[in-house]
């Protein structure tokens, strides 16, 4: 019996009157995740594309895989580097160590987030929404590898409930869910999100990795600059991603592969991506020319979460600007704000998280102004 036939055979048990009717939303969620919904328009003529929202989310997850895989390797690399054992560590050993450190966080993120979504759908008698497929993998990639699992679970619960569900679910949230989780952690547990003691895994797992001494410290390049020191990492290491940082944000090459996938499949707006980089470069040039920032413009781009945020966060179709002109303004605003926060607020050397959340808040206003401007222009032409 095929999986399709097996699901069809089970369907009557979940329909009204069936003994498992209370779990119909769970059945529908699994069915539509595995197969394209077989829907017929009740009025008018429509052509249904095979790409629905779940397939779009799946493509975004696929685009994140290069950054995730390199992040796993970098976890092991930073651990071996900190232990002074880089010469004897193997690439596969470092990758497996990183995978064993990261997978529990991904599992906790999905279990807590999807568990809340399932429970919420059951409570409201609605279909399970698919938006958390992307947020579930984004959240572990934008936090330090040393973050305790219970903190991650708490942040996921907060973000899903208070950023998404109470606003109506998928497609109705004002702020990016993954960034809301990170903001919750940043303001609630700053010691676990910033500083120089959180960027390298310090313990062995399943016989892999190295145990680091208590009190070991390792600063990110942006953290070094904030403390008045120069960046020790080479440009090559910055681009490859062999530097301390959150799991998925370090490798520009891996992020670029994800960007190509998103642009090629027309899932994310290249205008938003490009304008974020333009805004960041313009502000970086201004600050560097005035002596306010020691970093070159390209260092601002390749360090921290700038590239990751520009590709995967700023382009969120729900929370970003939707008008074509608005995308340029929205992206430029985020890029410029990220560099401004980095330079003018030494206590928070990253900047990208707050810049994107600020952009999310401004996106509806940007779209409104663009639409009103077009309406006013057409009204003037009509009077001529």
Task: Mark where each language-model region is.
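Long hydrophobic alpha-helical segments that form multi-pass transmembrane helix bundles
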Residues: 171-256
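C-terminal ends of transmembrane helices
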Residues: 41-47, 113-124, 161-171, 257-265, ...
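Structural signature of hydrophobic alpha-helical transmembrane segments
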Residues: 95-109, 146-155, 238-252, 294-306
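Hydrophobic, membrane-inserted alpha-helices
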Residues: 112-117, 132-141, 156-163, 254-261, ...
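Loop-to-transmembrane alpha-helix initiation sites
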Residues: 153, 174-179, 297-305, 327-329, ...
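A beta-strand-loop signature enriched in Asp, Gly, Thr, and Trp
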Residues: 273-324
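N-terminal signal-anchor module of multipass membrane proteins
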Residues: 1-106
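Membrane-interface helix-loop-helix junctions at boundaries between adjacent transmembrane segments
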Residues: 127-208
């Amino acid at each position: 019996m095929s999986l399709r036939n097996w699901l069809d055979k089970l369907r009557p048990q979940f329909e009204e009157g069936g003994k498992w009717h209370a779990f119909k939303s769970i059945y529908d969620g699994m069915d539509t995740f595995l197969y394209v919904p077989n829907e017929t328009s009740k009025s008018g003529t429509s052509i249904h594309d095979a790409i629905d929202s779940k397939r779009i989310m799946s493509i975004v997850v696929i685009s994140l895989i290069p950054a995730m895989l390199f992040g796993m390797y970098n976890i092991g690399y930073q651990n071996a580097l900190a232990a002074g054992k880089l010469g004897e560590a193997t690439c596969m050993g470092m990758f497996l160590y990183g995978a064993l450190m990261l997978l529990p966080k991904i599992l906790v993120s999905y279990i807590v987030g999807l568990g809340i979504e399932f429970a919420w759908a059951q409570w409201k008698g609605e279909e399970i929404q698919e938006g958390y497929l992307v947020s579930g993998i984004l959240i572990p990639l934008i936090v330090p590898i040393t973050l305790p699992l219970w903190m991650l679970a708490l942040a996921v619960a907060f973000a899903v409930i208070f950023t998404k569900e109470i606003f109506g679910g998928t497609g109705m949230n004002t702020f990016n869910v993954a960034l809301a989780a990170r903001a919750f952690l940043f303001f609630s547990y700053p010691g676990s999100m910033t500083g120089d003691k959180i960027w390298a895994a310090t313990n062995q797992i399943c016989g892999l990795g190295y145990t680091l001494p208590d009190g070991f410290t390792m600063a990110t390049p942006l953290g070094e600059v904030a403390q008045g020191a120069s960046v020790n990492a080479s440009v090559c290491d910055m681009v490859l991603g062999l530097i301390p940082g959150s799991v998925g944000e370090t490798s520009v090459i891996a992020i670029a592969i994800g960007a190509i996938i998103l642009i090629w499949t027309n899932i994310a707006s290249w205008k938003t991506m490009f304008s974020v980089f333009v805004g960041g470069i313009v502000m970086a040039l201004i600050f560097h020319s005035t002596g306010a920032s020691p970093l070159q413009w390209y260092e601002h781009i390749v360090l921290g979460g700038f590239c990751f945020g520009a590709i995967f966060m700023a382009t969120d179709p729900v929370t970003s600007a939707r008008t074509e002109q608005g995308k340029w303004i929205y992206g430029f605003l985020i890029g410029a704000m990220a560099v401004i926060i980095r330079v003018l607020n030494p206590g928070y050397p990253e900047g990208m998280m707050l810049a994107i959340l600020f952009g999310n808040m401004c996106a509806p206003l940007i779209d409104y102004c663009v639409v009103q401007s077009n309406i006013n222009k057409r009204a003037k032409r009509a009077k001529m």
